[in-house]
């Protein structure tokens, strides 16, 4: 998404045109190949990425830090307690100040609205590294992972099991942008937000919703799940018993296509949303997903910065 000043923000998959998302994905593949071949790239030497964390993270922090460094740049980490974002200083003022110091801002926050407001007032690119509503960087890594293992994602069917959370919201947006289908199995009361489903369907995604996990898994090309309780939402969590039928185990995987993959953004609660047998099994690609956060996010950083005359 570009604002009125031509700044490219990576807000959601719905805010970036399909052609540009595909270009980012292909760039990620190319950058990964060059890295594996031992090539060194430093297009953003001297550039700085501010990383704002209101929610703790392992994969997001390390992958963005390493990615920016591999591109030649540097990072500075700011925690919510250090910044008091939107409390002691307005988000608008914070955005304007940070824009004078750094070349891009990455934010992992609890509130989607805070991320949107930061992007509204920043004069450098803002990247959504996770909000309670969406997780677009993760899904770009997932699409990359699927295509590495199984080829073009177009026309394939993903089956989601469990809570209708932020990862699912970005998955259905990706379905519209990359032309694949999503079967959603959630217990009543845990459905995804309707605005994301409505947008995906209006933009061509095939979305099926059910309370029956076996129906959703039937013939699917990929089974996806996440923790039953998202980080920071423990006080509002439903009892685990309602999710037990949605556990991804060998019996559920057997309902999918024999070549189906298993995905999970991690960290996983083994024995809850997924069994050891599945997550450690041959169909699981969870650690490839984790690695591909690095490559996808490097391509996202490059997409945000390229048109600002900051390297390639």
Curated annotation (Swiss-Prot):
Which residues are listed for carbamoyl phosphate binding in this entry? 57-60, 84, 108, 135-138, 265-266, 293
This enzyme catalyses: carbamoyl phosphate + L-ornithine = L-citrulline + phosphate + H(+)
Q: Which GO terms describe its biological process?
A: arginine biosynthetic process via ornithine; citrulline biosynthetic process; L-arginine biosynthetic process
The superkingdom of the source organism is Bacteria
Keywords of the record: Amino-acid biosynthesis, Arginine biosynthesis, Cytoplasm, Transferase
Give the Gene Ontology MF terms in alphabetical order: amino acid binding; ornithine carbamoyltransferase activity
What pathway annotation does it carry?
A: Amino-acid biosynthesis; L-arginine biosynthesis; L-arginine from L-ornithine and carbamoyl phosphate: step 1/3
Q: What is its EC number?
A: 2.1.3.3
User: Which residues of this UniProt protein bind L-ornithine?
Assistant: 166, 226, 230-231
Which enzyme type, at the first EC level?
Answer: transferase
Pfam families cross-referenced by the UniProt entry: OTCace, OTCace_N
Q: Which GO terms describe its cellular component?
A: cytoplasm
Q: Where in the cell is it found?
A: Cytoplasm
Spell out the family assignment given in the record's similarity comment: Belongs to the aspartate/ornithine carbamoyltransferase superfamily. OTCase family.
Function statement: Reversibly catalyzes the transfer of the carbamoyl group from carbamoyl phosphate (CP) to the N(epsilon) atom of ornithine (ORN) to produce L-citrulline.
For this entry, the protein name equals Ornithine carbamoyltransferase
Source organism (scientific name): Brucella ovis (strain ATCC 25840 / 63/290 / NCTC 10512)
Q: What is the lineage of its organism?
A: Bacteria, Pseudomonadati, Pseudomonadota, Alphaproteobacteria, Hyphomicrobiales
| Gene assigned in the entry | argF
